[in-house]
Curated annotation (Swiss-Prot):
Binding-site residues, ATP: N58, F59, S60, H61, R97, K185
SUPFAM superfamilies assigned: Phosphoenolpyruvate/pyruvate domain (SSF51621), PK beta-barrel domain-like (SSF50800), PK C-terminal domain-like (SSF52935)
Subunit structure: Homotetramer.
Record-given protein name: Pyruvate kinase
Taxonomic lineage: Bacteria, Bacillati, Mycoplasmatota, Mycoplasmoidales, Mycoplasmoidaceae
Annotated NCBIfam families: PRK05826.1, pyruv_kin
Gene: pyk
Amino acid sequence: MIHHLKRTKIIATCGPALTKKLWTLAMLDDPAYAAMKAEAYANIENIIKNGVTVIRLNFSHGNHEEQAVRIKIVRDVAKKLNLPVSIMLDTNGPEIRVFETAPEGLKILKDSEVVINTTTKEVAKNNQFSVSDASGTYNMVNDVKVGQKILVDDGKLSLVVKRIDTKNNQVICVAQNDHTIFTKKRLNLPNADYSIPFLSAKDLRDIDFGLTHQIDYIAASFVNTTENIKQLRDYLASKNAKHVKLIAKIESNHALNNIDGIIKASDGIMVARGDLGLEIPYYKVPYWQRYMIKACRFFNKRVITATQMLDSLEKNIQPTRAEVTDVYFAVDRGNDATMLSGETANGAFPLNAVYVMKMIDKQSETFFDYQYNLNYYMANSKARHSEFWKQVVLPLAQKTAPKRKLINSDFKYDFVVHATNNLNEIYALSNARLAAAVIILTNDPQVYTGHGVDYGIFPYLIDQKPQSLSKAEFKSLANVAIKHYQQHGEISQLKQCLGVFHNKIISL
């Protein structure tokens, strides 16, 4: 057992694998579904205890009532455990999907001609299928060219455009391989300048639903420009929801051309490697993943690595060694959070997937180069000019960093406690990658649940305003919070702990 509270956060996508086939709120109160309800609650409790701090709801699938069921279960369990859990709404966004196929799908053979209907909506048959998008107004005919590739189902089917029939709104292609496609599978048009609207009416309805359920994050699909972020921020401002944090999903070459601006305009970045790896050459994805992690650290923003991290665990118990290495080095490079998608949404072993990711994350943290972090990231971070950084963050990083020759040794501190509602202070403590977990004492419910993505940050809800605490009150509450997270982190022997009181570092 590695005895420290895991500081890298885990985002788990919630779907039927976790909350079973509970589709309506009424089902939660129906005795006929009592066993299913008990299993769903037990699953969510298991993953939260194993380090999940964010539940992601993918609004490309399911309706509002299904998502309301999941939110209720998560909130009930989080309250029972007295742990903060963030809710992330992942927008449908400007994506193109197969409209509808028969249950057995549509089998496409290599070298066959395939017709894509871009405006009519018909069930797929005879090598023809229709496409749809959330806006309902998009016409793919306007975005493709003869000779261009169209990738379907995460690239499992490759089509090449043979001709374009603008009169009948059809794209005629030649299949490059055999594959069976199914309803709602994604289409990608590599290097296309998509004319599809960034925010559809469906996206806005989904966001409105999320706001009524007090979501903490919006993961915005296919952000390509800073204007996309501004559009979303303006909408949130109009709904009195500026506190909701925006995570820009980077999924296209267009976005990479504007990446620094997008990072600065957003609250964080999701390296969405699935679609990104279809929109750009796959061998460039690791470079851009590394670049985005470094840039987010520099600009004091959050960064999430996502997609196929433990993909084999959808069907298997053991991860591949390549997957283990992938997760390990995402943490080692400075990620805030690692994400599970299909593994927990639809996989056969969702609880195991979370446990595996937890153990890899914790192992990587023991080898994290805290001295390099001090000498490079902290010396160059945009946050370094603040007084709080100079008086508190840098001294804490220096004090808690373990001695290192080849590997880390001499971890002396388990926790740092700070009482604050100041987001800039919380972000600075997270970005510093301290060699100790940071407990934030807060009386603000939005601060309490709003930091599930932030590396090393563990809020604890108190009644008093942080700035009103006396030193004795601060120490008393800090020790209560430490005991709470010591138990959650399965830390049998507590090491030293530090506090930040009126910007001075004190022993606890």
